[in-house]
Each structure stands twice: as C-alpha cells, then as structure tokens.
C-alpha cells in the first residue's frame, strides 16, 4: 500500500474540486439567460495577480475561488493621509471617519484628521464579460478588495464567494460589488461583510438584467457610522434604468440604506429577510419603482424611510395581494413585520409599467422565509439544485492588518492616484 502525504492528498482533492466546480441553479428574474463563462474549463488562479488578470481578460472563463485571496498590503498603504470626521461619528474609534477622496467635496467643512488605510480596498477588480466566479464550499474568500463591473460588461455570474475587509473603519474605504452600465449579472450565494462603504452598489449608468439572490449582507462591525455596531452603507441603487430582482437574501445588523434606490429604476424585492436593523431599510427616491412582496422584517426600526421616499412603492399587504396578477401572472405575497415599524407604500402604478423581461418569479409564503433564508443565504450553502443545505458558513474575522497596518507605505503619488481614481467613479 502506498501512503500519500496528507498535504499532497488535500491538494489533490482541492484540485479535483476546482476542476469539477460548476454553477448550481439557474439564473432567474431579470438576470434570466445569464451564462457567465459557459462551458469554459473551470480553473483556479494561483495567486492574487493571476486572479486579477483572469477577471479582466477578454476570454470566457469559469474562475474557481478555492481559497482565500488576500489583497491587503498588495497595493501598499496610505499612511497618515487626509481624512475627515463626519457629524455621524459621535463615538470616536467605534465610529467611521471618512477618507478624503480627491475630486469629491464630500468631506466639506468636516474637521480634518489623518488616517491610515489599505489602497487595495479603494478600487475593485475589474471584471470583463463572460465570466463565472465561483467558490468551493466555504473556502472562497476575497479579502481586502471588491469586484467592479463597468463600461458595458455583461453575462457575469458571481456565486458562493465571501468578500470582506475593505477598510471597514472608514467611509469611502471600498465597495464589495459595484456595477455601472452592465447587463445580465447574477449575484448568488454571496456573503459581504466588513466593508467601508457599500456592500452592493449600482452607479449612474443603467444596469439592466440583474438578479441578487440567496446572499448574506452582514452588517456587524466594530466601526459603525451609526455608532451602534451596525453598518449603515449597505445596498445602493443609483442607475438610471436599473432592472433588479432582489430575492431570498438575508440582510442583518444594518442601520440604513438597505436598500436606498434612486432614479428611473425597477426593483422587485421578494422573500428577503431583514433582521436587527437599527435604522431604516428601504429609502426610495424620486423616479424609482419598487415592488416589495413576501418579505419578513424582524426587529427593523424603520422598514421604509418616510422622510425621503418620493419614489413609487408598492409594499404588498393582505388586502391588495391580488393586484399583482396582471403584472406578474400570479397574486403577490403579503409582507410580514414583527417588532418592526411601518412598511408604507401603496402605489399600484408600479405594476402598470412593470417590465416584461423579469419573467416568471415564484415566491413562498412568509411563514417559510426566515428559516429558508437563514439556511440558504450566503457561502457554503449551495447544496444541490440551487436550494442549498442548512450548513453554517465560515466565520471571517479582521486580519491583524485591520488595526496593525503593514510597515510598507505607499508613495504620495500612488496614494494620490488611488484616491483620485476612486473619487472619479464613486460620488454616491
């Protein structure tokens, strides 16, 4: 009998897993028809440089995230750089100061201060068209850098990946997943935690054909803009003409913008579970059209921000559930609220102009939502057939560099470039 070294055996098994990795489930909602890298041979990049290269190249790819890719320190550190103290930070080190981004006057007259942050987090990795990015089990982690889908890219699947630790101490520290001018994007079974700014954001250019599903937005943080251990900057939709299906997601320990939606867009939010939100969930701005059905809100202080909601919202209750039949081909499901504030919005005009491109959507009743979502949303829960198994995902804790910054610091020119480049694309 030949005995193999345990490390060699583990490496062989992981390699076989990478080769066998494929997307679980089928894109639905506005992202129906998305194929990502299609039949390209699955392959796992060897390091952060190769991951960046593969994401940005023009070839269809199935990119397997079979381990943690840690970008912290890979683009140097900005030491004692310009920052400010916003009015929201009334709790010192437990709050969030803001990075002063060149080209933006966000800091305005706020008191100036200095801060030290990692440059890699400021700008996400650019992802080209026809890509599938898929994690193995709960091992697929991208630490310290997000994903950026812009300039007309299309046909991209992101599944079973945990994105974490993008300068969580600082506003403008980095976005996990950002879209700006895209089409046919499926974000599924993703987890986001410990970010400086947005967990998921669409920029000003239209992002049509997008579905965000079965994902976990974990707002637990030591650096809170609301000074209560909850992350404020969560989900933001700013694209003119966005069409987004937002389904089966778990949004917890946030305090605002969960989501904030603006401009001429259509969002269909159903079968999501909001839990332990100390501020507001929905914030619907002018021009937005939002259909909210079959969701559960538990311990959410303000499910709908009434002070800043001039957009069109139809939040379904039991009395008007049948109104959806003409638009969706089925009755809507009423929302459920427990230990939460009021979910306002009864504008049935949202339905009259509903886009036909979303196709059939199947919603479960709210009594099933909390257990289903908590068992299936996030990483390590793909299971079979896309339904997911009730397994726990890997816990991510900040690396030592979150508080103990690496010794190498960026030159003034490289730090300034990073701040300018970030500000040019991030005014929201």
Curated annotation (Swiss-Prot):
Organism of origin: Aspergillus flavus (strain ATCC 200026 / FGSC A1120 / IAM 13836 / NRRL 3357 / JCM 12722 / SRRC 167)
Region (Disordered) residue spans: 337-367, 383-428
GO cellular component: extracellular region
Keyword Glycoprotein: yes
Stored InterPro entries: Pec_lyase (IPR002022), Pectin_lyas_fold (IPR012334), Pectin_lyase_fold/virulence (IPR011050), PEL (IPR045032)
UniProt-recorded name of the protein: Probable pectin lyase F
Catalytic residues as annotated in Swiss-Prot or TrEMBL: 257
Function: Pectinolytic enzymes consist of four classes of enzymes: pectin lyase, polygalacturonase, pectin methylesterase and rhamnogalacturonase. Among pectinolytic enzymes, pectin lyase is the most important in depolymerization of pectin, since it cleaves internal glycosidic bonds of highly methylated pectins.
Signal peptide annotation: 1-20
Keyword entries, A-Z: Carbohydrate metabolism, Cell wall biogenesis/degradation, Disulfide bond, Glycoprotein, Lyase, Polysaccharide degradation, Secreted, Signal
EC number: 4.2.2.10
A molecular function GO annotation: pectin lyase activity
Catalytic reaction(s) noted: Eliminative cleavage of (1->4)-alpha-D-galacturonan methyl ester to give oligosaccharides with 4-deoxy-6-O-methyl-alpha-D-galact-4-enuronosyl groups at their non-reducing ends
Keyword Cell wall biogenesis/degradation: yes
